[in-house]
């Protein structure tokens, strides 16, 4: 296992590699909190945004995207709120990525090889070598995100931290259907 100091160094360094929207991280924690709900209960976006100390209006957009992707159930009405639509072991980081970041390709090529090479050599260019490299990176990223489930993350949290306060907060802020 890596030391905590080494893990922090890697996290700091990793931030410069690729940037996901802040909504992606918020979505992860929303799903982890919804997982703690008692059966037949929901939680409001206001309660979730208060706990995470994030904008309620922005979090509502995040939750709407999670509902659209089929990761969260939405119940309307006086006792309405949100709940998980599937267990954490069936939700991958890639599922969350698709919900929050969209289904577009990660790297959209501008096909600059032909203008880069010039008129004569550019005519010979088939596939842009930069695009090919970025496609390889994209496939690796998708594979990696698809291999990590929220259940794995949740198990690490449960093992490392005492969740008494969080569990009590969930019970206090959940609403029975």
Spans of model-derived segments:
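Alpha-helical residues within the helix-turn-helix
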Residues: 50, 67-68
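Beta-hairpin "wing" of winged helix-turn-helix
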Residues: 70-79, 83-85
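Conserved segment of winged-helix/HTH DNA-binding domains
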Residues: 88-114
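C-terminal regulatory/oligomerization modules of transcriptional regulators
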Residues: 109-177
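A short alpha-helical element within helix-turn-helix/winged-helix DNA-binding domains
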Residues: 43-53
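Single conserved hydrophobic/aromatic residue that forms the stacking wall/gate
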Residues: 1-14
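Key DNA-contact positions within bacterial/archaeal DNA-binding proteins
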Residues: 57
């Amino acid at each position: 296992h890596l030391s905590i100091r080494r893990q922090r160094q890697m996290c700091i360094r990793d931030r410069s590699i690729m940037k996901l929207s802040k909504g992606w991280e918020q979505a992860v924690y929303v799903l982890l909190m919804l997982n703690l709900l008692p059966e037949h209960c929901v939680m409001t976006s206001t309660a979730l945004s208060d706990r995470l100390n994030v904008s309620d209006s922005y979090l509502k957009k995040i939750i709407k995207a999670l509902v659209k992707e089929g990761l969260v159930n939405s119940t309307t009405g006086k006792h309405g709120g949100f709940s998980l639509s599937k267990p954490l072991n069936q939700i991958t980081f890639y599922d969350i990525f698709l919900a929050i970041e969209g289904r577009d390709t990660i790297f959209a090529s501008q096909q600059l090889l032909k203008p880069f090479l010039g008129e004569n050599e550019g005519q010979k260019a088939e596939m842009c070598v930069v695009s090919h490299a970025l496609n390889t990176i994209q496939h690796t990223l998708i594979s990696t995100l698809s291999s990590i489930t929220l259940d794995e993350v949740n198990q690490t949290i449960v093992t490392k931290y005492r969740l008494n306060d969080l569990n009590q907060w969930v019970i206090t802020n959940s609403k029975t259907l």
